[in-house]
Amino acid sequence: MANILAIDTSTDTCSVSIGKENEVFSFHENIPRQHTEKLFSIIADLLEESKLSYEELDAVAVGTGPGSYTGIRLSCAVAQGILFSQSIKGISLSSLELLSIEANKESPSSTFVAISQENLGNVYIAESSFSDGDIKSKFRLISSDLFKREGFPEDCHFVGEGCALFPEVINVLPGAIPKSKYLLEIAKKRLNKSELIEPEEILPVYLNDENSWKKIK
């Protein structure tokens, strides 16, 4: 069975999980502005609790944002460092996809639309569907003024902070925060199917200079 480390620090909440065989060891706490200081010690504590070492990891999964500039750069850099040092591969998911995964467990639907917080009049959107336990998504950045409910499937469910901007949509999971345990579930499936990526392919989606959503290339 696989040993996987999953990390999401895209919000004020630091969420880290380790999957070992059929066990899950998790840390999920709101620690604003403390991610850089505490992330490595949190990982070390979970490795100790799970009786694993870095050398025994088969993959590292990371939530790549959008979200906190510092948080997602940190999680991606840490994931890359571990992957390079252990000569293993990784899995990445948008942090918006993690919201849809949780929402699908609470209120199943064929399609989910996760909407980010607004930045300079724009929102980042992930439109996701599920098949064989995995998630497939289309991403787009649009002006809040151009958002139309009619542009999405009639039976879709909405989730994310950005839902509050649009009275015509109902947030099916208010207050949802990306959770690494859901990232772990997808990571296991992709590892089993050998759908992994190289360390250098783990790229954050972040607020560039706090002015615009930008994906590093």
Q: Where on the chain are the PLM-derived regions?
A:
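Acyltransferase
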Residues: 174-217
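Residues at secondary-structure transition points
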Residues: 30-41, 69, 73, 77, ...
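Stable alpha-helical structural segments in soluble proteins, enriched in small hydrophobic residues
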Residues: 46-50, 85, 103, 180-191
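DPxDG-like acidic metal-binding loop motif
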Residues: 59-90, 95
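N-terminal beta-alpha supersecondary unit
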Residues: 1-64
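Surface "functional belts" at beta-alpha junctions
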Residues: 22, 31-34, 89-178, 206, ...
